[in-house]
Amino acid sequence: MSQGSDFAARIYAAINARDRAAIKALTAPDIVVKTTVEAYRGPEALIEWMDEGDDAFEDFTVDLLEVEELAGHVVVSMRQRGRGKASGAEVANHLIHVWALRDGRGISLQSFSDREDAVRHARRSAGG
């Protein structure tokens, strides 16, 4: 398993398990997390994102669909699923996460709703 695939498996397993210690261990102290809506900074950023999902949804989980290493980044196609606490409606949305790693830890995470935008971001961030 490649470093990127291993990292993706471990970080999303930690998110699904709500394992705060593992999330902190897998991310750098200066990680920058940019969702499609807002930005967060620091390891608590992923935990805040996870908690926001738990506040809005029952059974909030993330399913990995595809992991690819591209231009020095880890590009993860994933699906978030849950059931709305207020409405009871099943919700699933498809996102692409682009991770940058340093020494095996996440230093940045950018969310995209479109794969081509994610690929462009990875290539541009790598200077290509």
Predicted regions and their residues:
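Short, low-complexity N-terminal intrinsically disordered segments enriched in polar/charged residues
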Residues: 1-26, 69, 123-128
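A solvent-exposed, acidic/Ser-Thr-rich amphipathic alpha-helical stretch
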Residues: 20-24, 28-72
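Beta-strand residues in well-ordered beta-sheet regions across diverse protein folds
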Residues: 34, 77, 109-110
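Short, surface-exposed coil-to-beta transition loops
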Residues: 59-62, 91-96
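A short hydrophobic beta-strand element
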Residues: 71-80
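Hydrophobic beta-strand positions in extracellular immunoglobulin-like domains
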Residues: 80-82, 101
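Short, cysteine-centered beta-strand-loop-beta hairpins and adjacent loop/turn segments enriched
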Residues: 82-90
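Short beta-strand edge/turn micro-motifs at domain boundaries
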Residues: 96-120
